[in-house]
Amino acid sequence: MAMNVESWKNEERQPFVGWDFSYLEGRMLEDLPPWSYPARAATLMRRASSVVDMGTGGGERLLELRVSWPPRVVVTEDYPPNVTLARERLAFLGVEVREVELTRHGPMPFADGAFDLVLNRHSGFNSEEVARTLAAGGIFLTQQVDGRWAQDLLALFGARPQWPDATLANSVVWLEAAGLAIVAAEDWSGRFAFTDVGAIVYYLRAIPWLVPRFSVDTHLAVLMELQARLERGEGLCFEARKFLIEAQKPER
């Protein structure tokens, strides 16, 4: 037991940078949805003259699509360490990095019709603001983690999803109410698994809102039960949910 606890505490101390889970490669295994958000985003960027990537993290995902960037690229991010990282990675490439508190769903610091493409991968958004900042005929593409993601995992730690209303159906209603036409809307559920308990520790520390105040010390009993489950050959497999929406602002 002592060896496991020390190993888990070591995972707890590992740094997490940007929105990069490569540290868990081979230890967190996730089913893939039937669509490819990067491929769709790249196609839309090649047709655009301007794009804003909402909630870019450290810019790691956007950099992977650099060959498809339009002439004007703007990103927003609200977590200060990620803002700094995004500026270090993107500003010298001509990308405008803006610190915007998307979690508050307030106004974005952009003019009406500023962009003909708005991208959003796993970040909050205000439907009215998306519609306002889109040019006529512009496209909004978003992939979201369903608010009920991993609720079976969270329940083990006595936690509940904080945004259970973040669903495809609700998002479609909000976007349509803002005046956007839904081009595509896809829902998906699958499974994701961890190969060891330490990977769960790292994951929950990296995303602190999943289990508030999580630590090895405060949740040791749950971690020990997960270790016992693994040793019984039951696996550490949980429910994954995502959805994708492409919406368009009407032409003038």
Model-derived regions: residue spans:
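Short, glycine-/aromatic-enriched active-site segment of Class I SAM-dependent methyltransferases
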Residues: 144-163
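Class I SAM-dependent methyltransferase SAM/SAH-binding core
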Residues: 50-107
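N-terminal, positively charged/glycine-rich alpha-helical extensions of SAM-dependent methyltransferases
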Residues: 1-22, 31
